Amino acid sequence: MSAHTRITRKTVTAIRSTKGIGSLVSLTAYSAPMAKLVHDVADVIIVGDSVGMVLYGMPDTLRVTLDMMIAHGAAVVRGAAQACVVVDLPFSTFQESPAQAYRSAARLLAETGAQAVKLEGGCEMTDTIRFLTERGIPVMAHVGLMPQQANAAGGFRAQGMDPLSAAQVFDAACAAERAGAFSVVIEGTAEALARHLTGTLTIPTIGIGASPACDGQVLVTEDMIGAFDAYTPRFVKRYADANAVMRDAIRQYAHDVRHRVFPEPAHCFGYGKPLQLADAGATV
């Protein structure tokens, strides 16, 4: 690539225009190094509040703060030159009122440089989504299994498995579209429901434990590469065992240090050359 070639970041408008064309690739990232690994492959990078569980060892996403999301979102934007970056609004930063959501979302976009925010919720979030989008804040909706509402839902359970639940998920997704959301994540739902929603909505659906018929798919990158093994959701396909590779490297490093194999001459400065000490006049 020429040094003068300009790399263009994918926009919210570009993501929305992919409806029915190809399949969107989405992954998570919480740091600049991970963002650099995935930005030229992923269409969308989601800086998820799953950072609390994956990086901080939290039992759920409820303890994640807005300041945490801003810090991680800014790092990802610095590392990702091409993908559209979407940052989660964490629990308790948007549910109180549309005005609260606006203040939180405005901070996220202003302080991270991200292109959009993502928020979880059903039909009760319709006014909030509309309030944000009418004020220039792009919103990715999130329906179905919503980790922030796991306590109320009785745990991390698949949604849309009965007629009432299916209707609630369907209505929430349709309401989000009408309110101006540019796309919607459908998580942990009955496959037939996700397929039906994808055929009904005019905005892209991004599935995670949903359906191959969705307009795109997303996984937590650490789940997908095998770098997070506290537990593995049913919908995750592991493409590598990064933890095994890292453990082997760590063990090899420890072995080399204990046996004085590392550092080698190539890792040292002036190895084997005599050193003259200016004050003492001695050579070491």
Swiss-Prot record:
One of its GO terms (cellular component) is cytoplasm. InterPro entries: Pantoate_hydroxy_MeTrfase, Pyrv/PenolPyrv_kinase-like_dom, Pyrv_kinase-like_dom_sf. Gene3D superfamilies: Phosphoenolpyruvate-binding domains. Pathway: Cofactor biosynthesis; (R)-pantothenate biosynthesis; (R)-pantoate from 3-methyl-2-oxobutanoate: step 1/2. It is found in: Cytoplasm. The active site is at residue 187. It comes from the Bacteria. Keywords: Cytoplasm, Magnesium, Metal-binding, Pantothenate biosynthesis, Transferase. GO terms for molecular function: 3-methyl-2-oxobutanoate hydroxymethyltransferase activity; magnesium ion binding. GO terms for biological process: pantothenate biosynthetic process. The keyword Glycoprotein does not apply. Homodecamer; pentamer of dimers. Catalyzes the reversible reaction in which hydroxymethyl group from 5,10-methylenetetrahydrofolate is transferred onto alpha-ketoisovalerate to form ketopantoate. Belongs to the PanB family. This is 3-methyl-2-oxobutanoate hydroxymethyltransferase 2. The lineage of its organism: Bacteria, Pseudomonadati, Pseudomonadota, Betaproteobacteria, Burkholderiales. The gene is panB2.
